[in-house]
Amino acid sequence: LHYYKHGGFGQIKLREPMILGHEVSGFISKIGSNVENLLVGQLVSVSPSRPCNKCNFCLSGNQIQCINMKFYGSAMPFPHIQGAFREILIVEDYQCVSADGLSSEEAAMAEPLAVCLHAIKQADKIFGQKVLITGSGPIGTLCVAAARRAGAEEIIVTDISTNALTFSDS
């Protein structure tokens, strides 16, 4: 939303036209010859993270720690990395997770929800505790849901936008 509304965030500014989007799901239309466990027509959530497979972390099998990770819809490098909000997107099989039983909208929320679930895991003992969530945009709102699910006794949400707070409160 920051790219769309403000042309960037902080020091990161758009310097060329860029397709937005890193929250993505889609139906598989074609599969490569070596791909297993995915089917044409299947709905998948797509991870926006693409490791370099060249740094020390990647070479040791720890791609999640890649120091050159590329993310769909990022203006950090130049040229920018185009986003996933398009009709056709070619992805690697490791980026796809079956979203059977979900709508495409729900499947697209897998990445932001994963951010929130990771935060809950890092916080450790949430059950019965007071939790502060700073910012009630899409991620903050999902964090409210995750904190509720984890059994937080009280959830306090802050934001500079009254509209965002009202939405988070519901």
Question: Over which residues does each language-model region extend?
Answer:
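Hydrophobic/small residue at the entry helix of a nucleotide-binding pocket
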Residues: 115, 139, 147
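Short Gly/aromatic-enriched secondary-structure transition segments
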Residues: 2-7
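Residue-level preference for short coil/turn positions at secondary-structure junctions
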Residues: 39-40, 92, 127, 151
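NAD(P)H dinucleotide-binding glycine-rich loop of Rossmann-like/cofactor-binding domains
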Residues: 54-134
